[in-house]
Amino acid sequence: MMKTVMMMLAILATAKAEPQLAAASSRVILLLDFKKAYDSVAREFLFLVLLRFEFSPMFVRMLRKLHDGTTARFLVNGELSEPQEVVSGIRQGCSLAPLLFILAAEVLALSIQ
């Protein structure tokens, strides 16, 4: 998601810097495909966003501990793999996951306004 946000910020900056683009159309339709959205959120970015939105550092530390050390196993040809560490993304199935994703996406929404 961080790459998507950075790309959109670059596009917006270019549109603002190019007067002919702004003159051609004062309205822009923005469509984003959040494919594998929860997996695409950089955890450090999420924690920084939470701190910027003035969530308590204690709450952010709690979320960090919840996400640190996350592992996943895969079923390949009927065999279960060894646990693999998951280093990015929001824990799927967590009741906070939709809210955390919305907060991370809010950075993009605020930059568009």
Swiss-Prot record:
One GO cellular component, as annotated: host cell
Signal peptide: 1-17
Location of this chain's protein in the cell: Secreted; Host cell
Motif RxLR, residue range(s) on this chain: 61-64
Record's keyword terms, sorted: Secreted, Signal, Virulence
Domain of life, source organism: Eukaryota
InterPro entries reported for this sequence: RT_dom
Pfam families named among the record's database cross-references: RVT_1
Function: Secreted effector that dos not suppress the host cell death induced by cell death-inducing proteins.
Family assignment from sequence similarity: Belongs to the RxLR effector family.
Name the UniProt record assigns to this protein: Secreted RxLR effector protein 78
Originating gene: RXLR78
